[in-house]
Amino acid sequence: MLDQDLGQLGDGLLFAAVIVYALAMLGFAGEQASRKARRAVTAVRAESKVLLGAGGPPVTLPPPSPPAQTITVESPSRAGRFALALTFCGWGVHVTSLVLRGFAAHRVPWGNMYEFSSAAALVAVTFFLVLVARGKVERALGAFVMLPVVLYLGLASTVLYTAAGPLVPALNSYWIKIHVAAAITASGSFLLSGVVAVLYLLRNRYDGRLAAGQPVRFPVSLGAQLPAAPVLDRVSYSVIAFAFPVWTFAVIAGAIWAESAWGRYWGWDPKETWSFITWVLYAGYLHARATAGWKGRKAAWVAVAAAGALIIDYYVVNIFVVGLHSYA
């Protein structure tokens, strides 16, 4: 098979992976809808149970005590199992698309923004599947994870698409296997942690309105479908705690590569500046949790701000800002 054919096949498989991920997202959403329906039926039945006193007025049962802030294991639904299977299938197709892309270009498959985005999304999906397999998050959370992944890959396949080909001369170095691979791993993980931080804020807002007796409207009402707020907080923290050392290594490796390519370790190029800003925000997040006890809303907002800096670092700087990294 010709290199061009391999490249086209890899592109087609990525498109297929996006379709499978989208179907998985619908399956996860279906599982959430079925759980919501079961909870509604259970609530109606509980309210309808009345104890009749001896010759007295009806006495309603007291409301049950609130559940503990842990993940509850419910009977698996067919939609949820099917969605998880689809996610695994999409993951396999996604991996194959990247491998074929590498064979077609005769290099590592992360030499441009299109390939970087695909690889980072793959890391996010991989991390999610690992968390589900280890019981750290509920399977139904996949609806909220797959949505940004599908949008992310859709953007990469349309706006950022680049045909398979050789590296630009500036990237033709063994450091691309080290520096960029670390950046991809950290970026995909940070993408997932940012999504979970947003979901935490949604759940926290939902709990607050419910406790205050205030009306709950969309999108805050989506918080009812999410795991408990402390669970989301722990998941976001765990992912960032893993990704931050990897990002630190990526920044250091990039500085070493810069010295080899441009004769200096650091020059405050726009890419370097925003990579450092991103590093500072995530370092501040971890430091605040460890020393000041920042958890919950404060920590979540810092995580969201850091994810925003990462997006600026990757998209805005690479596309709209002229600098030494403009070729990326």
Where are the predicted features?
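Polytopic transmembrane helical bundles with strong interfacial aromatic enrichment
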Residues: M1-A328
